[in-house]
């Protein structure tokens, strides 16, 4: 297996060698997800792909870590392919791959997630994006791929009926990763967040994050004893400003959003200095 060195932590234009690359593949839907294996199918012919993913469904856990319980890794097989199944979260999977299993990837790919990861909301809650951010924080360029699901109930259904959509998505994964390997990872970017519409009618669009993906709501129900319990639920946002990831997906374009780990609000520093009389 060909190993690559991690890039400098400073965002820069990362170039790749001409050797067969090593790609670490993970996700948050679990090691048995059809989306994960669609990504594998897109990559394995021209890259050494190491699969290390959660053993179970871990959607919406963001970049959380398992620090109060031990982590176990088992090997699982899919045909003649061996993968690592981690009894933890997506971020745990990345950390164990890098620091326990000795994987030295040239690039980390997270996905294909079943369901879009758009807007401020998804970036901070998505386990798919969280895994990519974790890899980037350790110096590895990372790409998160997600497929739009118009009916959110499909998120947790048997995904085999999405085979036709995964076929198109595999082409996107293959093209995006080949472009990166041939031309280099973009400067000042830690993670590329790629969202694929359920039906592609346009091309690539470079976007920025919308504010919302969902209209947040809470559904109250009663258990058999009359005690209330709640589901956090709500419909998808139907539109967003031009140039945002949500708007691009609604147009049928493939949204590519550059993400950085630096969450500092630089534009707010002057107001903070005035607030604390530091001018």
Curated annotation (Swiss-Prot):
Residue positions annotated to bind a divalent metal cation are 28-29, 59, 113
Protein function: Nucleotidase that shows phosphatase activity on nucleoside 5'-monophosphates.
Question: What is this protein identified as?
Answer: 5'-nucleotidase SurE
How, per the record, is the cofactor bound?
Binds 1 divalent metal cation per subunit.
- The gene for this chain is surE
The alphabetical list of record keywords is: Cytoplasm, Hydrolase, Metal-binding, Nucleotide-binding
Primary location group: cytoplasm
The cysteines covalently paired via disulfide bonds are: none
Q: Which reaction does it catalyse?
A: a ribonucleoside 5'-phosphate + H2O = a ribonucleoside + phosphate
Q: Does the keyword Manganese apply?
A: no
Q: Which GO terms describe its cellular component?
A: cytoplasm
HAMAP family on file: SurE
Q: Which organism is it from?
A: Methanospirillum hungatei JF-1 (strain ATCC 27890 / DSM 864 / NBRC 100397 / JF-1)
Q: Which cofactor does it need?
A: a divalent metal cation
Enzyme class label: hydrolase
């Amino acid at each position: 297996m060909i190993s690559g060195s991690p890039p400098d932590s400073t965002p820069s234009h990362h170039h790749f060698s001409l050797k067969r690359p090593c790609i670490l593949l993970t996700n948050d839907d679990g090691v048995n997800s059809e989306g994960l294996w669609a990504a594998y199918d897109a990559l394995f012919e021209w890259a050494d792909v190491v699969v290390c993913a959660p053993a179970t469904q871990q959607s919406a856990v963001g970049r959380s870590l398992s620090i109060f319980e031990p982590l176990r890794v088992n090997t699982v097989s899919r045909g003649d392919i061996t993968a690592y199944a981690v009894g933890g979260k997506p971020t745990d999977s990345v950390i164990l791959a890098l620091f326990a299993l000795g994987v030295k990837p040239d690039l980390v790919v997270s996905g294909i997630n079943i369901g879009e990861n758009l807007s401020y909301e998804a970036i901070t809650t998505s386990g798919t994006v969280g895994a990519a951010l974790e890899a980037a924080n350790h110096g590895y360029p990372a790409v998160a791929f997600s497929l739009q699901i118009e009916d959110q109930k499909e998120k947790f259904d048997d995904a085999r009926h999405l085979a036709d959509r995964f076929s198109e998505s595999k082409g996107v994964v293959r093209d995006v990763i080949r472009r990166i390997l041939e031309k280099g990872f973009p400067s000042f970017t830690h993670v590329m967040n790629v969202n694929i519409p359920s039906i592609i009618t346009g091309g690539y669009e470079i976007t920025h994050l919308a504010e919302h993906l969902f209209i947040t709501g809470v559904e109250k129900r009663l258990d058999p004893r009359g005690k209330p319990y709640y589901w956090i639920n709500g419909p998808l946002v139907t539109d967003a400003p031009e140039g945002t990831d949500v708007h691009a997906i609604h147009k049928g374009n493939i949204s590519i959003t550059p993400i950085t780990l630096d969450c500092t609000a630089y534009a707010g520093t002057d107001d903070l200095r005035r607030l604390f009389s530091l001018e």
